[in-house]
Curated annotation (Swiss-Prot):
InterPro entries, per database record: Cyt_c-like_dom, Cyt_c-like_dom_sf, Cyt_c1
Membrane topology of this protein: Single-pass membrane protein
Listed name of the protein: Cytochrome c1
Species: Rhodobacter capsulatus (Rhodopseudomonas capsulata)
Assembly behavior: The main subunits of complex b-c1 are: cytochrome b, cytochrome c1 and the Rieske protein.
Source species taxonomy: Bacteria, Pseudomonadati, Pseudomonadota, Alphaproteobacteria, Rhodobacterales
Length: 280
């Protein structure tokens, strides 16, 4: 018992330290969070627009089939539009013929490789930790999941207009981001022990979002904050397209198990209670 208690405390402490790596990521309420949460179709469509017009230049989604854009629970775009959209993307080498052809809706989104290209965004929402809970305890991840959408949202909106006071000139060719933890930091922004004194660090990626960068088809004002929320939601759907269906299945399973437990209890009372009283 003592060893178990020590192990549990150690895990909590170590987990807290890891969670503190992204302690500057603040909580944000998305529509798909919680047991009954669902994706907002309008938001997914706006997020897809931001991805296709802004992010897709440098970031691919090589694990996401294009056809899923018309699936239930997602953006549910018109299949004809999806086919035309696929045909307008980068061409692909056919696996059977070895010849170059137009991309089809059954193919994956293009990938982006080479100098200046960013990481693939297919599962980015599951690969980054967001809000860690009180004091970086990691409780938020335990009860609400890893929080990747929060990280994405805070990252794309986390480029301040001015650099921190400790390095007003910044780093040439890099851009300060308030939640990015693994980038470069000037010596002027470190204490005597060499630990950085800023919340974030400098990243190679420049700010990608600006007010009115896109024109939303539904008329929603395209502020940086709005575009950040929308693209984060879209990337969460891209990483977890069956999230809502899985929640519903889990809820049904819990209800069925609850009913089964009640039935077993009542059956036990009905069949065995008289014999237990006789034995007593």
């Amino acid at each position: 018992m003592k060893k178990l208690l020590i192990s549990a405390v150690s895990a909590l402490v170590l987990g807290s330290g890891a969670a503190l790596a992204n302690s500057n990521v603040q909580d944000h309420a998305f529509s798909f969070e919680g047991i009954f949460g669902k994706f907002d179709q309008a938001q997914l469509r706006r997020g897809f627009q931001v991805y296709s017009e802004v992010c897709s230049t440098c970031h691919g989604m090589k694990f996401v089939p294009i056809r899923t854009l018309s699936d239930d629970g997602g953006p549910q775009l018109d299949p004809t539009f999806v086919r035309e959209y696929a045909a307008g993307l980068d061409t692909i080498i056919d696996k059977d013929s070895g010849e170059e052809r137009d991309r089809k809706e059954t193919d994956m989104f293009p990938t982006r490789v080479g100098d200046g290209m960013g990481p693939d965004l297919s599962v980015m929402a599951k690969a980054r930790a967001g809000f860690s809970g009180p004091a970086g305890s990691g409780m938020n991840q335990l009860f609400k999941g890893i929080g990747g959408p929060e990280y994405i949202y805070r990252y794309v909106t986390g480029f301040p207009e001015e650099n921190p006071a400790c390095a007003p000139e910044g780093i040439d060719g890099y851009y300060y981001n308030e939640v990015f933890q693994v980038g470069g930091v000037p010596d002027t922004c470190k204490d005597a022990a060499g630990i950085k004194t800023t919340h974030g660090s400098w990243a190679q990626m420049p700010p990608a979002l600006f007010d009115d960068l896109v024109t939303y088809e539904d008329g929603t004002p395209a502020t940086v904050d709005q575009m950040g929320q929308d693209v984060a939601s879209f990337l969460m759907w891209a990483a977890e397209p069956k999230l809502v269906a899985r929640k519903q299945m889990g809820l049904v399973a819990v209800v069925m198990l609850g009913l089964l437990s009640v039935m077993l209890y009542l059956t036990n009372k009905r069949l065995w209670a008289p014999y237990k009283r006789q034995k007593a």
